[in-house]
Amino acid sequence: MNLMKSSGMFTLTAIGSCRIVSPVKRAQPYFNFQANFKRIYGFTHTSSEALQQIRFILGLIDIPEKVRPFIFRPNVNYSNTDVHSRSDFYIIEISSQKKIMAYGFCLQINYLTRHFYEFFSQTERACMYWSLATQGNRHKLLAYLKDDPCFAGMSEDDRALLSNINVEQMDEHAIEQDMMEIVQLLGRDRVMFMTHVDAVTRAGTVILSRSRLIKNVDTIAARMDIPCVNPTNLMEKWGQKRALEKNGDDLTHYTDMFGDAIVAAIFKGVINNTNHHLDEGRQEKQDQIREITLSITKQLADGDIIAASQQLFAALRNQQQDPVLIQLRSVIFSHLGYYEQAYQDISDVEKIIGTTDSTLRCRLRSLHGLARWREALSTAEMMLSNEIEDEEVLTVAAGSADALQLFDKSYHYWKRVLLLNPETQSGWVNFLSSTQYFNDGNAFSEAFHAGIQSQRLNDTFMETALSLAIKFSDELIFMHALEQLLRHESEFALTVLSTIHDTGLVIRTAFCIKNMSYHQALRTSYKDKIHDVFEAWNNTALSLHSVDDFVSLSTSLAYSYSAFMVYPHSRISRFNNEVKMAWRDKLREMYEREDYENILAGAKIVWPLLKFDPVGTVYCARTLVNLGAWKDACTLAHMTLIRNSNITSLQSIMLRSIRHINNIPFLIDLIANVMSITLSFQNASMNKLFEKECRNVATRALKYVRQKKTEGRLDEALSVLISLKRIEPDVSRLMREYKQIIRLFNESRKDGGSTITSYEHLDYAKKLLVFDSENAYALKYAALNAMHLRDYTQALQYWQRLEKVNGPTEPVTRQISTCITALQKNTSGKS
């Protein structure tokens, strides 16, 4: 089959986003032209990006390697021998006024935020970064980045780039200068401009910055007497729901058919009048193909693949080389599992019209079906850089990264899959599993707790969690996963318990099983298997019992006490007491000769048991004080005082350690927890000292909050403020700080642009409501973002709470009505 283009045609180049580039490619067979994308390196949004692209294709500038990943499409390389022959006509789309510069070059925001996904995925950090990356704020930006752990973990080149970015909101004059130079470079009779659409949000309002830009581009083009197409009128004729993706809610992407209609309007209204005669027969053919496509697409959506196939193959008998029909055949082949044929078809289509968003999706499905993981990942990443971010694309990206053992990518992609659809159980398992390749357990802990919050887990998730908790020595997650698996009488859990050597986890296992025995009925056969595990641990304790080696003695105590906790038989009890007395004697002897390092080594082994032994705790806590380990000394004293609150020596160690600790969140939690046991402090001087330390910690915490505000770390400031409510009686002082945090966040988020998702905005709003559940700003903010996520149930609750706080108002009443209507439609749709 010969599907290659013929030469000598009218040539057309589109410079802009996928909104114009993809439909121009699709239109080639129907408007008798050839799309010329030689040396076009990627999508553009601002007038300055378009001008930079034009200078590059004309050979006036080169793009340095260090900025190419943030300007060029992924996996695209150009040689210096590539030549862009001037096209007969150029369409220049200008859809943004947010100009991002580094090293004198315009960067593409989607490529930038994809490369630095982890950095920009945190709402507060993204907001603060964009607000500081403006002219005159460089010293503040560098100070902010210097203390950011995510930034610190980047490569030297990445840190340098983020440090050198400058953001500018272009005004009308700057845009006009770019447009004038574009016309000068391309020629007045060869160029036209195009704007974005002035679409409305779910709240029924336009995006003001977009409206201003559309008006500016229209006005400038009119002054220059250059054609300009504003698709807004066409969108209004079509209806926003038909014109824009996601039933009109995606304000960024056009449906294929609306994009095709825009190009048709450009040819009929602009190009046909100046440069190129249209073939009416070809346009009629396009209309026929559109009707066939609509019918087949509906049949596929209804699951009637037989009818869709019959109609398609009937159409192909008359239109064997039509790229739209061949692409539909690729879709059907993928549905049927004929991935080789699907891939061949879509490859043929791309030879005719080039790569578009929809051909990329066909290619993605066929490559995934063929298990060609590297190509599938490359295709998925190209789609993501084109802002095509849905569950299918991210799942293929994550699964391909898994297969290629690129686990850092796998982690980030599974995380994004679960943001879109938290109900996929296999996604949670894969997400958790991908964290095993990180050096620390932070990613593992984050993934586990996110999974727990989703409440959509299974035993496979818990088995993965148990294994990784051992790897990262995370005792709390270990206990959580173990308890769940033991309830289900998991054989996997027993296998794991028989092989662990971490004494902390051995002790945690004993606590877990002892607590379960009061609430959970297990079968006798399973209990016998658990008993065998503890017998083995008791035998380990016997083998390690040595009064000459404190570390071995501590290990023996951990195993013997664990066995005793669950099975307090006389034999096990006697042996445990023997080990405990020998351990305590050895501890006293070592303390007297100031052998602090060995005491510390043994104390770490039996740490969870020390709270049951106040005598041993006093020696260990004093050892920690002598070593300057104030936080550990304080923690040990506190956990023992919870069980034995009247030990004055431990009270003194705990309270006098506080002044040496600089971890403010730790101190707030400590003070709040100690408040519950101070009634047992029988020493007046200890009570007086505690009151003094309470005031001191509260004052230090407020200073910490203000410092974090100054640094722009509003999330940290808010977290501390929420905790501080537990110990600070003067709430008015805290409320002042809270209102300032809201003001600063509101200012910074305006510069966050499209880098921040509604999920993250909603999470932040919920956090604001933790501090003040009746704050009007936070309620409105949460409601709007819940609506953007189509969570109308949650949005309705926020609007109703806002109405209760502020009283009925017309805008809130209208939003409540919108939510109720949406919920009724959802209910009727399901029935």
Swiss-Prot record:
It comes from the Bacteria. InterPro entries: TPR-like_helical_dom_sf (IPR011990). Pathway: Glycan metabolism; Vi-antigen biosynthesis; Capsule biogenesis; capsule polysaccharide biosynthesis. GO terms for biological process: capsule polysaccharide biosynthetic process. NCBIfam families: PRK15180.1. May be required for maturation of the Vi polysaccharide. This is Vi polysaccharide biosynthesis protein TviD. It comes from Salmonella typhi.
